[in-house]
């Protein structure tokens, strides 16, 4: 009987050890599953944070900048000396189209845009080479 008691008493610590190992494995598996879930949803969480950031109001934003459909002009922030050149008015005639190897003698519409000299010289060179053909 003493041998059976010793054998039974030796099983208890082994069972406890096995239970502890199983609990540790379960905890590790739960941590791994948690980390996998976190990694699988990272893209969605980033998109959500960015969306919330755009929707949040900061002190520098105005009501007009938060309204959808309002076009914001950031050109002066990106390039400080940049100013937009105005579009030509709708009252002017459109440039003539090339038809049967003839060209309009009217000046190009680029002159209306105040194009820099090198571009105008390039345009004259291109127009001259077309006339020779």
Swiss-Prot record:
Record GO terms (molecular function): ribonucleoside-diphosphate reductase inhibitor activity
Keyword Nucleus among record annotations: yes
Post-translational modification: Phosphorylated by DUN1 in response to DNA damage which leads to its degradation.
UniProt GO BP: protein localization
Segments of this protein annotated with the region Disordered: 1-40
Compositional bias per record (Low complexity), positions renumbered to this chain: 16-32
Chief location bin: cytoplasm
GO CC term, one of those recorded: cytoplasm
InterPro entries for this protein: RNR_inhibitor
Subunit annotation: Interacts with RNR2 and RNR4.
Name of this chain's protein: Damage-regulated import facilitator 1
Native source species: Saccharomyces cerevisiae (strain RM11-1a)
